[in-house]
């Protein structure tokens, strides 16, 4: 996906990928990571996700990376958070007490930004990439994460030929084939969420599975 695709989506506010509620898998399984309250948590392609508020409420320091400037600004304005803005190389850095967002390309995010994180949360990043770019993203994510860091990964899977992504289908087989070199993987849950997603129902997608994985960086 070219950057212009996402910039246009945010400009037109065609952001169906933005969830109005905290992700149920995050609420249900985050405690499985057993992190200390002050742990730093990396959220790639974070948008203006309310999930970051949940993570902050657990006492974590949230570090997000988001391509689009409007998404970052809306996160702070929607949640009535005062922030400071500075420049970090080619990234804009927006910061409030517990949330620090870097606006720019995740592929050029300096590794020092994430060198102290103990965990990560990916709900909308891996599934945002078509297959030819997904492996590149997965390698960059692994590159940014310290060994031993834990993560909660949430994916969607469906017959890809029935719908043009994003979100793109990411199967358990893809996870096994492309993430095992860098991560230990444990499946936490998988359930059909088709009834909760009208866009997929309208396109007559026969099934839609949402899965949660616990990952550990090797």
Swiss-Prot record:
It catalyses: S-adenosyl-L-methionine + a thiopurine = S-adenosyl-L-homocysteine + a thiopurine S-methylether. It comes from Shewanella putrefaciens (strain CN-32 / ATCC BAA-453). This is Thiopurine S-methyltransferase. Belongs to the class I-like SAM-binding methyltransferase superfamily. TPMT family. Its main location: cytoplasm. One of its GO terms (molecular function) is thiopurine S-methyltransferase activity. Keywords: Cytoplasm, Methyltransferase, S-adenosyl-L-methionine, Transferase. S-adenosyl-L-methionine binds at residues 10, 45, 66, 123. GO terms for cellular component: cytoplasm. Its EC number is 2.1.1.67. It comes from the Bacteria. It is found in: Cytoplasm. GO terms for biological process: methylation; response to metal ion. SUPFAM superfamilies: S-adenosyl-L-methionine-dependent methyltransferases.
